[in-house]
Amino acid sequence: MRALVVSIWVFINLVFFGMCGYMYLLWSQYWMYIEKDTETTTNTYDQQIYYYNRGYPMNETLFRIQNNTESKSRIKHAAKDAANITIIRNSKPRFPNVQGSDFPIDTDRYVCMKNDTAKACDNKTQQYKERLLKELKRVFLDESNVLKPGQENYYNVVYKGPKENYMEKTPKQILCELKNVELTTLKRSDIKHDLYGLRSYIPKRDLFENNKFNSCAIISSAGSSTKSSNGKLIDSYNLVLRFNNAPTKGFENDVGKRTTLRILNSQVMSKDEFKFLNSKMFRNITILAWDPTNYTASLEDWLAHPEFNLFPNYIEYRKNFPRAKIYIVNPRTIWKVWDYLQRNAPNRLRRNPPSSGFVGLVFLLSHCDFVDFFEYVPSVRITKRCHYYEPEDNASCTFGVWHPLSAEKLLTYYVNVASDSDVFQTGFVRVPGFNKLQC
């Protein structure tokens, strides 16, 4: 009798576990089908954002996606062939949950109106601040998920240092650590093997060596600059930094008209559509160009195989304008900035270089009494528009696409000394320069 009961009990358990296993197989097959069904759309979206965030106009972006999706071998050989572009494949959108998020975008709900009382304005500002910081933290945690697709390590990043929580340190400690980060431009003495005849055109000194400025402004290209009316304020700074091909003409009321320095990614310098050699936008200013390299590559490796070959146009520009001030970031030191970000983040960062914005901030902090960064931490005018000068929408540009943007912005706000009204209503964070620090 006991044997019969045991047999029935074993049989029932086998049936139960068998049914569970069968249901699991059905469920997993269903999700595999969904993954395959959405893979094409996802990859197109991801590549669109990759190209767009690296400097291509949207119409050129879509053209390049269509012409590259069948060319898988380009990824494998991208590091060896400067004409090839590393395409982000088999990965999720960089901000996959933005549409499902309850974070308000393109609304004037939190904008302080003329008839608002001071208390009402403060309440709006605090409500927006809480929601924005919560959203940035959510994106940061989402991006650090090691099981999440899209965690490719294209630059072979091997980080072995600590991962600390920046909030357990004081803002002064964070800035003192940043002060010790070596971020430099290429100098003539750095180049030992001159492959392109480049050496004689490289400056002998570092960018802004021995130069100091009182007030510095960095103008992001964010769509939230629209209707800010910050133009006159921006033009009042001693130094004004802009990015890539962001225009001022027609947008002076919001972003000003003065430009002292432009940071250009290597695509803007190397691709014909940006007219680097002919556009007046790139004349009579200081230019700082950058191009990423492998995390462990030597300078000689990068000079031989840049991601995008900016050197021919760099040399031609120097020939055309011998007195021009044009510099190139030492690509090895860009990863020192990434190491700094990872060291102050308890979770793993996306293993791509930091953004041009954060690189620009680090550069200027060594030369400015303070740096005001406009619309880096997005104000109440936050919008899905990527850029103030183009109509295309994509909220991913604000919260993180290819660079570890959410981590950068959280850290920058943590060391900010501007009031919440300045940050979230006017639209700038203020970071004190290194010369004001007592480390």
Residues covered by each model-derived region:
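Metal-ion/cofactor- or nucleotide/acyl-coenzyme-handling active-site neighborhoods
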Residues: 2-439
